[in-house]
Amino acid sequence: MRHTALLPLVSSFIVPALAQIPGQTTVNATVNQGRFGNATYDYVIVGGGTSGLAIAARLAEDPSLSVAVIEAGGYYELDGTVASIIPGLAAGANVGTDATEYSTVDWNFQAQPLTSANDRSLRYNRGKTLGGSSARHYMVYQRGTRGSYDQWAELTGDESWGWDSVFPYFQRSVNVTPANMTGRFPNTTVTYDPSGFNKAGGPLHVTWPNYGSPWSTWIEQGLEAIGILPDTDFNTGTLNGSSWAPITINPLSQKRDSSETSFLQQSLKTTNLTVYLHTMALKIGFDGTTASSVDVRSPVGRFTLSARREIIVSAGALQSPQLLMVSGIGPRETLERHGIPVVKELAGVGQKMWEHPFFGITHQVNLVTATELAINQQALLQALNQYKSQQGPLTSAGFGVLGWEKLPNSTLSDSTNEALATFPSDWPTIEYLSIDGYLNGWHSAADQATGNGQQWGTIAVALVAPLSRGNVTISSSDMDDPPVFDLGFLTHPADREIAVAAMRRIRQAFAAISEITIGDEVVPGADVSTDEELLDFIRESIVPVYHVAGTCAMGREDDPEAVVDPQARVIGVNNLRVVDASIFPTLPPGHPQSTCYMVAEKIADLIKKGN
């Protein structure tokens, strides 16, 4: 039985109430809207997403500079549903991986069939809105390990990308508010290291929701029973243990905080930043090998935006390489196949794609989880009433506790250990996620109403040291044609072995909290027991965490696979940078929004200093 009629109820009930919530950002619908027609700016930024709005806002702080942002979408608060705003409805906002799923604030891309996962083709979330994917994800804010960024320094030949050097840029973007324990249960106490943050940081808010789910408290116990200790910190360079996850929400309103509600809204109050809404970047124009303009299409027609100084591409890890390729930068064979004149041959464009896949185990449980909101209208009404006072389960994004573990070498084969040796020693192998509901592949939000009134609890794992790589390419010279991308899940044998080992670890954690489970394991089921059976289940249920990165990788200029240099400048051309997750040399363990902001802060600082 599935209950799918509750979201309209949410909209009709909560929309009038949003205006009453303190700390709400008023949407500035004019956003210093650029006039549709040819224009020239000092900096033209393609993409108003996580990194794009951050770097735009920082550059616009200089009153002598003119800065324009090209964004294909609009405001998610206006174009989307309230599920984009309320953390507890994020699952409904994100929709699922089925091809029939659709969001008005998303590109709704479809990945190529997964050759090592039963040829499943998954719909893939990418924000088509101001804020980009910071308006779409589950808001987790945590940083990678010290070693992961020190490895960036090694790969780029630039020590300024090491942990000690990038740490201040992490701090610059955010301000942290300690958890308000008034509405949280006593056993949901938050522990963190304040030294990870700076009181002068901002404008992005980081805090903890005013609700900690009972399910997550049990996950914390289960993880501790298998050696994953609680009360660790996620933002000072170590990921080893579990804790309540900090998320990017406004501490007063308990609403999502994105690059739009933070960086853009602050910038609109103090600068002359110009934003072109619902405007599609079609092609970068060059004078020889110097980037000079961007051809765009708006609701009223096509025109050209020229840049006196630089064009900065921040279109995300799928569309930044796509835009480079349709503009003449990329693998020669690809460009020539589509009749695109070669401006600069760069074989690495679109290659070395990283992503974190995840899957998990679900049990029926004897406590109330977020499942109740999907199957019980009265419970949802009660939660909505609580949310009007910034309390209750809708302040939380459907999870609470995250955990990290580096699997012992003794549990893995020599070949897998050898493959994992390419990662720094402090890099965890897997991340545990406490999901307050049902998971068996992420088909749609209606998954949460599976069954006949049961309460579900899931422990999921993400492979955060993946060895499989994907790629993205183009099908034509037209940006209107979606990018063609292969996530590459499970193509490396080490990932398959680690995935099976992770499933067995989840079962050990569940065994330690058996007093709250009802009956046998539901997903995948107790009869799925051999390595082969577990791997078959993983192939059929593995889904992305939407952390795609690395497709315009940063590296040394003599690295044949590098696309940008350590200053994010596209190699071999002038006045063109890429600033988003596509330039990550590796994808640090965990959730990348913190690193997207850090990269934007660092490159903005370099530009301001004349580099």
Swiss-Prot record:
Name assigned to this protein: Dehydrogenase pkfF
GO MF annotation list: flavin adenine dinucleotide binding; oxidoreductase activity; oxidoreductase activity, acting on CH-OH group of donors
Residues reported to bind FAD: T50, S51, E71, A72, H137, Y138, M139, V140, A581, P592, Q593
EC number(s) per entry: 1.1.-.-
PANTHER family recorded: DEHYDROGENASE PKFF-RELATED, GLUCOSE-METHANOL-CHOLINE GMC OXIDOREDUCTASE
Enzyme class (EC, first level): oxidoreductase
Swiss-Prot/TrEMBL keywords: FAD, Flavoprotein, Glycoprotein, Oxidoreductase, Signal
Signal peptide: 1-19
List of catalytic residues: H547 (proton acceptor)
Pathway participation: Secondary metabolite biosynthesis
Disruption phenotype: Abolishes the production of aspernidine A, but accumulates the intermediate aspernidine E.
Native organism: Emericella nidulans (strain FGSC A4 / ATCC 38163 / CBS 112.46 / NRRL 194 / M139) (Aspergillus nidulans)
Family: Belongs to the GMC oxidoreductase family.
Cofactor(s) it depends on: FAD
PROSITE patterns: GMC_OXRED_2
Statement: the UniProt record of this protein carries the keyword Glycoprotein: yes
Residue positions the entry lists as glycosylated: N28, N38, N180, N187, N240, N272, N409, N471
Function: Dehydrogenase; part of the gene cluster that mediates the biosynthesis of aspernidine A, a prenylated isoindolinone. The starting point of the biosynthesis of aspernidin A is the production of orsellinaldehyde by the non-reducing polyketide synthase pkfA. Hydroxylation, methylation of one of the phenol groups, and prenylation, presumably catalyzed by the prenyltransferase pkfE, would be needed to yield aspernidine D. Subsequently, the cytochrome P450 monooxygenase pkfB is responsible for hydroxylation of aspernidine D to yield aspernidine E.
